[in-house]
A protein has these predicted regions:
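Structural motif
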Residues: 4, 76, 118-120
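Helix-adjacent hinge/juxtasegments
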Residues: 54-101
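Conserved P-loop
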Residues: 2-69
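Short, well-ordered beta-strand core segments
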Residues: 28, 75, 155-157
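Residue-level signal for inorganic ion chemistry
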Residues: 17, 48, 76, 122, ...
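Short, glycine/serine-rich, charged loops/turns that create anion-binding
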Residues: 9, 35, 81, 124-125, ...
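Short, well-ordered alpha-helix to beta-strand connector turns
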Residues: 25, 56, 72-73, 114, ...
Length: 168
């Protein structure tokens, strides 16, 4: 099964996703896609790791999720926005190339046998309009990837103020 959890910043996506993962498995995998850009990001990563107990296996993977064996496992991937940022930066803001590579990676993990994937993403297009060209390009990339993920997901939840709304 593929579950997509989307919503705005601090809407409760990660908490909902973690609860779902623990309902599906006694030993879920947590895949963090954040790149360690600076000390602040490292502190954020450390804090998030401390929030999860011994039931979780933590994996840090910036881009190539297909290198992880998800077969017969439940995995929470948090989050698509940071994952896409890594492709976008590495491909010098090339939307088409970033989207193509991210889709390819997703299809690779989605085809693994007997896997529960819980994917957290952000609806950044619902917020303030980006003031820079790069910001607008990234918003488009995120929107197109979210549409692709939602079309491939079995269930999609929109988080609003800590409340989950099933939309698919």
């Amino acid at each position: 099964m593929i579950y997509l959890i989307t919503g705005g910043e601090r809407s409760g996506k990660s908490s909902f996703a973690q609860k779902l993962a623990l309902e599906l498995s006694n030993a879920p995998i947590y895949v963090a896609t954040a790149r360690k850009w600076d000390a602040d990001f490292q502190n954020r990563i450390d804090r998030h790791q401390q929030e999860r107990d011994e039931r979780w296996t933590n994996i840090e993977k910036e881009k190539y999720l297909s290198e992880i064996d998800f077969s017969q496992k439940t995995a929470l991937i948090d989050c698509v926005t940071l994952w896409l940022t890594n492709f976008f930066v590495d491909h010098k803001n090339d939307v088409a190339l970033s989207l193509e590579e991210a889709k390819k990676e997703f299809l690779s993990i989605a085809s693994q046998k007997d896997t529960n994937l819980i994917i957290v993403t952000n609806e950044i297009g619902m917020g303030v309009h980006a003031s820079t060209e790069i910001g607008r390009k990234f918003t488009e990339l995120q929107g197109w990837m979210n549409q692709f993920l939602a079309s491939n997901a079995d269930e999609v939840f929109l988080m609003v103020s800590g409340i989950s709304v099933k939309i698919k």
